[in-house]
């Protein structure tokens, strides 16, 4: 609707983290409308990615203190399946419990998302509306496996593999795994991957901002040559 509203037949689609999932899903459904992709912090919504992010054997091994706090709102029976436990809490009629859970969920991702933690302020955590909205939406989609088959993107890569793409991924991204971006690039004929050496997952880290700006310049020049 936005594309049609502004009268564009095709456009460059960009996204970060969950935005990469949406961008690629859009491209698979409407490849004729996409001139290219710039994707930062690739996330494909797979079970293994969810396990990495929320189970004990993934990012939790690097942030055991933060993971302890993440599990704190959950009943003991839910600590082996945090996605399910948080789904119940966030959907609860108990507003106090739901808000406490939303802050813990939100803080977990904030604490593991960046090598530069200067952007994490008390306002992020204490803004209960922001925390609750973000937590409720993200948990809803992840609890339902993003409403996608586990290998959806690899099974449908043929629909977008001719479209140029630049993938950017922090070397120390603890939210989304760099090997997922690497595997996607291997399957995508017209994609390149830049691993940002001193960056995590956050979109506002200095090297990530620089890489994203340069990627837009590269893509603009490429598309201009393609048009001419």
What does each model-identified segment do?
Residues 149, 174-180:
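Conserved alpha/beta-hydrolase "acid-adjacent" motif
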Residues 191-228:
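Catalytic active-site module of serine/aspartate enzymes centered on a nucleophile-bearing elbow/loop
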Residues 1-11:
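Conserved acidic catalytic loop of the alpha/beta-hydrolase fold
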Residues 100, 178-191:
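Active-site-adjacent alpha-helix of alpha/beta-hydrolase-fold enzymes
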Residues 160-161, 167-169, 173:
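Short beta-strand/loop motif that positions the catalytic acidic residue
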Residues 140-157:
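Active-site nucleophile elbow and catalytic-triad environment of alpha/beta-hydrolase enzymes
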Residues 9-48:
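Conserved hydrolase catalytic core segment
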Residues 32-86:
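A catalytic-pocket lid/entrance helix-loop region that shapes and gates access to the active site
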